[in-house]
């Protein structure tokens, strides 16, 4: 039987879902312009690097922390990790991009569901206390829908893989079939990544590969571009 609650969360994983993810490459465009990423093989290497070295240690750990804070009704912990998500994101374009995507996701979630936690989260932003982040909103939505933390993380990883692959299809460019082959290969990597996220300590939060951040920063100086970040 189909689990409709999981499907409701998976709706937010659609690469065409209007959060603005299609406008952000998170530094990939810099690698493409340098021809470091130029085909399916080199894109997969970059995608592994992004998922393993940046997303895992920022969004991934934060989602686990937020989920348990929701269970324990710990608002201070949510505000703390949300602030850390924002300040540890040093590249300006990716920091602003995450804020914009988080704001759009929260507004869409509130249009579709009556979640007290997401409404509280949105109110914190309206009161100028925080910036909104998609990883926090996605976790709150999954919790509201009764989805387990393991599945929430899996879906979020898939959403990032899918949207970045569609962006690579446009930018490198790759064929649509090649893009689907990338997603198929990366799906096998999701479970391993989630296990790693669940095993990490909170002190590991914020670790990332300097090369990724440098290329995200250097994207600010790219004059001919497809993406905002």
From Swiss-Prot:
GO molecular function: nickel cation binding
Record flagged with keyword Acetylation: no
Compartments in which it is found: Cytoplasm
Main localization of the protein described in the UniProt heading: cytoplasm
Signal sequence segment: none
InterPro entries with a match to the protein in the record: UreF (IPR002639), UreF_sf (IPR038277)
Gene3D superfamilies: Urease accessory protein UreF
Alphabetical keyword list: Chaperone, Cytoplasm, Nickel insertion
One GO CC annotation: cytoplasm
Family per record: Belongs to the UreF family.
Record's function text: Required for maturation of urease via the functional incorporation of the urease nickel metallocenter.
Full protein name: Urease accessory protein UreF
Organism the protein comes from: Staphylococcus epidermidis (strain ATCC 35984 / DSM 28319 / BCRC 17069 / CCUG 31568 / BM 3577 / RP62A)
Gene: ureF
């Amino acid at each position: 039987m189909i689990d409709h609650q999981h499907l409701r969360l998976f709706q937010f994983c659609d690469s065409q879902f209007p959060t603005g993810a299609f406008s952000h490459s998170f530094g990939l465009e810099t690698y493409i312009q340098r021809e470091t990423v130029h085909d399916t093989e080199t894109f997969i290497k970059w995608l592994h690097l992004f998922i393993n070295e940046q997303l895992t240690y920022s969004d991934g750990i934060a989602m686990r922390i937020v989920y348990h804070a929701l269970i324990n009704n710990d608002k201070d912990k949510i505000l703390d990790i949300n602030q850390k998500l924002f300040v540890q994101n040093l590249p300006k374009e990716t920091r602003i991009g995450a804020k914009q995507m988080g704001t759009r996701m929260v507004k869409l979630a509130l249009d579709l569901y009556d979640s007290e936690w997401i409404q509280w989260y949105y109110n914190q932003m309206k009161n100028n206390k925080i910036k909104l982040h998609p990883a926090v909103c996605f976790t709150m939505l999954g919790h509201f829908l009764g989805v387990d933390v393991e599945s929430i993380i899996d879906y979020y990883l898939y959403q990032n893989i899918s949207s970045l692959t569609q962006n690579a299809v446009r930018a490198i460019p790759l064929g649509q079939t090649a893009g689907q082959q990338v997603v198929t290969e990366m799906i096998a990597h999701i479970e391993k990544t989630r296990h790693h996220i669940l095993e990490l300590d909170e002190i590991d939060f914020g670790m990332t590969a300097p090369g990724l951040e440098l290329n995200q920063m250097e994207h600010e100086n790219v004059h001919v571009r497809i993406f905002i970040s």
